[in-house]
Amino acid sequence: RRQINELIKFTNNRNLWVNLSRLTLTYMDKGGENEVFHDGKVSVIKLNNFEYAGDDLENFFIRITVHNKFFSNVPYQMIGFAYNSEQKFCAVLIQPYILAEREATEDEIAAYMQALGFKMDYYDEYHNEDYEVFDAAPNNVLYGIDGNLYFIDTQIRLKS
């Protein structure tokens, strides 16, 4: 909680607030950590409440950086901070909106992750020397109309 309070102070001092009421957004979905909206054009906006960051917010920032390293075809861009519908402090993230043919299969995900140098631990969990990727399940990986895979909502952490 202390880190959240420090980040709120940082946001205030640097005027990093995103005024969501000025954006034309359509609600799409809500999960454990994200409220997801579409801008009607080419982007998905996620309000991430840091739920899965644990006690150290650095985990969140590592996750975003590593996601962009391995899954650069659907990168996160953090544009600021806001409060969500439950009045929880959130990072405001933008990702490209993906035109998907379907969800990726477990076999497609496994082949993709192995090509990146990851080893499978479980059907939706992988690791390499430095990182663990989990929740790489079909509902979080899209098979695009272009035939590419898009990892839109996986969890990543430093390997312990």
Model-identified regions with their sequence ranges:
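Juxta-kinase regulatory segment immediately upstream of eukaryotic protein kinase catalytic domains
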Residues: 1-23
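ATP-binding glycine-rich loop module of kinase domains
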Residues: 21-72
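Conserved hydrophobic "DFG−1" position in protein kinase catalytic cores
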Residues: 38-39, 97, 143
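Protein kinase-like catalytic core scaffold
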Residues: 43, 91-93, 132, 150
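Active-site ExK catalytic segment of metal-dependent nucleases
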Residues: 44-51, 96-98, 153-155
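Conserved structural core of kinase catalytic domains
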Residues: 49, 68, 72-122
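Catalytic activation segment of kinase domains across protein kinase-like and atypical kinase folds
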Residues: 126-160
